[in-house]
Regions:
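Hydrophobic alpha-helical membrane segments
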Residues: 2-315
């Protein structure tokens, strides 16, 4: 039996558990949070399957008895696909509604997963900053769910508005540009307009991410206090504005190269799928593995960007 009479504080010292704390800027590393990565990957995989299940079931029912399965749907020209989609009956509306419902649920729960991942990236346990429990990160993500969802909705609306305005303006001015600049020059002007709008939408997305990670970090820091969403949002906006004003090239560059690489990976995956879509066996298995590898790599890039964003908004 241990004797604590000589040192009354020894018992408290022995049984004292390390507390979850906010990480300093140089402690934030995405690679140090494998459990959060794995949980996020599981969620993405589960909801990808859930979104694809209605149409996959419908296709299996309609084309399961075909000698080639659903391979005709992927042939060039899309005649079989268009004929199938044009068939009368309630199947298509049911599939569209059910797929959309699952997609909406995925988007909403995605904000919770985002918050949990950022909470795991921004907090640690004890002096060694070990990864917090998954339940602790989910709790922080749940508390930040409303604010993050609102920020995502506003940022997404602004991004779509900018892109839609650019496309509309480009189409509206097409005939005038053709008459005054010539068809070739008009095309380059329209392309430049679309590219500028895309860059603006990307910058809005960067700012939105900075606001959201600042919100989650603030929630994690204020876990024991009750505070209005508006006050937390004001602080998050101030931190995001400060980060984008002081380090604009760092923020945009850190997001930009990761977004470009992520898009390139999607293109590689799509090309591999196109090359092997009509094959089976080992080729199909390789595509499935490649798809999961690409998904994991894109998740790593996303987590890496969020870690960088956290560093930018950490005072």
């Amino acid at each position: 039996m241990m004797d604590f009479t000589e040192n009354p504080g020894a018992e408290a010292h022995v049984f004292e558990a390390p507390e979850v704390r906010l990480l300093e800027r140089d402690e934030i590393r995405a690679r140090r949070r494998p459990r959060a990565w794995f949980a996020t990957w599981l969620w993405e995989t589960a909801f990808a399957l859930a979104v694809a299940t209605p149409i996959q079931t419908w296709a299996g029912t309609a084309w399961g008895a075909h000698p080639e399965g659903d391979a005709p749907l992927f042939r060039e020209g899309g005649r079989a696909l268009l004929a199938w989609l044009g068939e009368p009956g309630p199947a298509l509306p049911i599939v569209v509604v059910s797929t959309f419902a699952v997609f909406v649920v995925a988007v909403l729960t995605g904000q919770l997963v985002f918050g949990a991942l950022v909470a795991a990236l921004s907090t640690g346990v004890g002096s060694r900053a070990t990864e917090p429990r998954l339940a602790t990160s989910i709790s922080a993500g749940l508390r930040a769910l409303g604010a993050c969802s609102t920020a995502s909705l506003l940022a997404g609306t602004l991004q779509l508005g900018v892109l839609a305005s650019a496309i509309f303006a480009s189409s509206f001015a097409e005939s005038w540009l053709d008459d005054h600049l010539g068809e070739a020059n008009a095309f380059y002007v329209q392309l430049t307009l679309i590219l500028v709008a895309t860059a603006m939408a990307g910058a809005m997305g960067v700012f939105g991410d900075l606001v959201k990670v600042a919100l989650v970090r603030d929630v994690a820091e204020s876990s024991l206090t009750r505070e209005s969403v508006s006050s937390r949002t004001r602080r998050a906006l101030a931190l995001a504005f400060h980060a984008i004003r002081i380090h604009p090239s760092l923020a945009l560059g850190a997001w930009g190269w990761r977004a470009a690489l992520s898009t390139l990976l999607v293109g590689i995956g799509a090309l591999a799928l196109h090359k092997t879509s009509l094959q089976g066996g080992a080729a199909l298995g390789a595509v499935v593995l490649a798809h999961q590898a690409i998904g994991g790599a894109r998740l790593a890039l996303r987590a890496s960007w969020l870690a960088r964003a956290l560093k930018l908004v950490t005072p």
